[in-house]
Amino acid sequence: MKKKSLKLTALFLALSCFPAFAEQTVDIEVQGIRGFRAVRNTDLNVNLINKEEMDGSERYQHLVTKAVDRGLRVFGYYESSVRFERKQRQGKRDLLIAHVTPGEPTKIAGTDVQIEGEAAQDENFNALRKNLPKDGVLVEHQTYDDYKTAISRLALNRGYFDGNFKISRLEISPETHQAWWRMLFDSGVRYHYGNITFSHSQIRDDYLNNILNIKSGDPYLMNNLSDLTSDFPSSNWFSSVLVQPNVNHKSKTVDVEIILYPRKKNAMELGVGFSTDGGVHGQIGWTKPWINSRGHSLRSNLYLSAPKQTLEATYRMPLLKNPLNYYYDFAVGWEGEKENDTNTRVLTLSALRYWNNAHGWQYFGGLRMRYDSFTQADITDKTLLLYPTVGFTRTRLRGGSFATWGDVQKITFDLSKRIWLSESSFIKVQASSAWVRTYAENHRVVARAEIGYLHTKGIEKIPPTLRFFAGGDRSVRGYGYKKIAPKNRNGKLVGGSRLLTTSLEYQYQVYPNWWAATFADSGLAADNYTAKELRYGTGVGVRWASPVGAIKFDIATPIRDKDNSKNIQFYIGLGTEI
């Protein structure tokens, strides 16, 4: 019997070691703290307390006091106090209110941040030191930690791989409510690039070296390596690039291996589309991204539609000095067009030199030769032209295939003279500018303008493709494609020597990827710039930001047309809007 009694006692003692299942009996509310971040951080710490502890007891109040202290310390409040008040609520758990008195805040009394080693002369570190907090601001632990991280990250980005903090302290004086930053960072020496090698490349090393933005002996900079992953693919010679740096602590150098994966030797592109101006059209492109070890390439394109057909092949020769930005293009092409009162066949040859600069501008200059056989209105002729051409372009786009921001600038200058065996003399200048901007996400504005000037003694000797016509999509909507131009006595289109078109379009997003549009266009294709030659059109439309680009549908009509035209024109198109 005694043994049985002892067993029961032992069982009772064992069970008593485990607390009964606790239950939340109060809700907590913290009051008296100002500042969104301080409130959020304090609430976060309080909410980390297990719900089973929320019974309103002194133990729970102690846990809340500690949580409040942790939440406020990081913002410079080291002497906070908490007074608790418990309120009963009918039909709800009691409410425990924590009345917090943060106390006097601790403020920064001084910052002592020193840089030793080669980084002491580095302007980037000096710039970082200018961002220290000013005396008198509240001390925040996160600001201190972020600054330390910024120094460490900058050191790694700029090649100070041996850098370390000899001193890093946040000193607090609760009695005086003051704080001091103490940091001493020893950067050591800055590493430099060592051997730079290429692997798997089909292009000669001397061409690749002139694409590099670094050379052996240059100071290390991580951004340089990031640029390489975009520079080499932009040549179209490679499908992908892998940059592998190897840090050598003994020699204080960084060897770089650039692994290049060549593109396939042949690439084909097929496309089918529809537009009101050209109807159904198809396109076939064939490209050889690289032909030899000097990076020469060939691209060809065939375009077919009812009114227009083109075939063009271009041979590109990059220059050794700067293969990405300096190159020659040699092109041969054929074009046929039968539209309105135009029937033309053209054979073209060109040799152009291109220069690309760091600001996005592309300049070109060279020679063009063309043989035209054409009928325009009632005149049939053949002509051979040889003329120099120069120009420049710039394209800036953001937002993918349906740009939210961007602009395109173009200008060309052509000069033909009989003195160099060209059958017609002329001067032609043509410039265009297009802009797209998005405001407050839902408001989009597209603006375009184009001007052209052709000086010649006899426009009938100039091929139709060099004359000016207006009307249609991307010109003056409300009119048919190339229907605006001077006419002869028989009412047939001749083409003009002056061109001016403008367009302003407003779009509003009515649904994700869907935009309603309204627009007004104006322009002329004439023999002089006069107000009476201007044509106006206005309309409305819909835009769909599809994965392959903008698909649009427009309805437009002329305004105050001098021929009293009231025709309504419909436009359907696919592609970039500028």
Swiss-Prot record:
Record-stated family: Belongs to the TamA family.
Localisation per UniProt entry: Cell outer membrane
Role noted for this protein: Component of the translocation and assembly module (TAM), which facilitates the insertion and assembly of specific beta-barrel proteins into the outer membrane.
Keywords: Cell outer membrane, Membrane, Signal, Transmembrane, Transmembrane beta strand
Protein name: Translocation and assembly module subunit TamA
A Pfam family this chain is assigned to: Omp85
Organism: Haemophilus influenzae (strain ATCC 51907 / DSM 11121 / KW20 / Rd)
Signal peptide (residue range): 1-22
GO biological process, one term: protein secretion
